[in-house]
Amino acid sequence: MESFSSKSLALQAEKKLLSKMAGRSVAHLFIDETSSEVLDELYRVSKEYTHSRPKAQRVIKDLIKVAVKVAVLHRSGCFGPGELALATRFRQKLRQGAMTALSFGEVDFTFEAAVLAGLLVECRDILLELVEHHLTPKSHDRIRHVFDHYSDPDLLAALYGPDFTQHLGKICDGLRKLLDEGKL
């Protein structure tokens, strides 16, 4: 007998539709104003660091696609108990990374690229484990692309260097607000 699930089909269609529409309008359904401002600053950092508008756009587009897909999976109740524990671990690790990034930004001479890069790599690995059975290999590649880009020690060193002070300040302001509001 053929196995058919309209819920599964609807979820596939939703993910497919969202993957085609990872622009600003769809992102605002899942990403609040503060998060959007942080993403805009991350885009500017990537653009200035890589000297490539298309590369910076690709990273942010991949980040938004992944965030939206994970949000859809979570809101649709697709994660089992073990996966929900992984989701909690991911959120805790992401929060730890945000607090570390803030600390490095606020306290002079404390920045260590290896520490922040390590936290981002841990986040990547937890997220990949979380979505292993729910997203396609292409989405897994997007996750790797985003986290590998932002965990690059050279990019992190540039971000915490004198040329990116303004961007870092805005990113830290956004992270602080997200942490204070319990959104991160």
Swiss-Prot record:
Expression induction or repression: By TNF in fibroblasts.
Protein name: Tumor necrosis factor alpha-induced protein 8-like protein 2
Knockout or disruption consequences: When infected with lymphocytic choriomeningitis virus (LCMV), TIPE2-deficient mice exhibit significantly enhanced CD4(+) and CD8(+) T-cell immune responses compared with WT mice. TIPE2-deficient NK-cells exhibit enhanced activation, cytotoxicity, and IFN-gamma production upon stimulation and enhanced response to IL-15 for maturation.
PANTHER family: TUMOR NECROSIS FACTOR ALPHA-INDUCED PROTEIN 8-LIKE PROTEIN 2 (PTHR12757:SF4), TUMOR NECROSIS FACTOR INDUCED PROTEIN (PTHR12757)
InterPro entries hit by this protein: TNFAIP8-like, TNFAIP8_sf
Subcellular location: Cytoplasm; Nucleus; Lysosome
Tissue specificity statement from the Swiss-Prot or TrEMBL entry: Expressed in thymus, spleen, lymph node and small intestine, but not in liver, heart, muscle, testis, spinal cord or brain. Up-regulated in the spinal cord of mice with experimental autoimmune encephalomyelitis. Constitutively expressed by macrophages, B and T-lymphocytes at various developmental stages.
Subunit relationships: May interact with CASP8; however, such result is unclear since could not reproduce the interaction with CASP8. Interacts with RAC1.
Family: Belongs to the TNFAIP8 family. TNFAIP8L2 subfamily.
Modified residues (Phosphoserine): 3
Organism of derivation: Mus musculus
Free-text function comment from the UniProt entry: Acts as a negative regulator of innate and adaptive immunity by maintaining immune homeostasis. Plays a regulatory role in the Toll-like signaling pathway by determining the strength of LPS-induced signaling and gene expression. Inhibits TCR-mediated T-cell activation and negatively regulate T-cell function to prevent hyperresponsiveness. Also inhibits autolysosome formation via negatively modulating MTOR activation by interacting with RAC1 and promoting the disassociation of the RAC1-MTOR complex.
GO CC, any one term: cytoplasm
Any one GO BP annotation for this protein: innate immune response
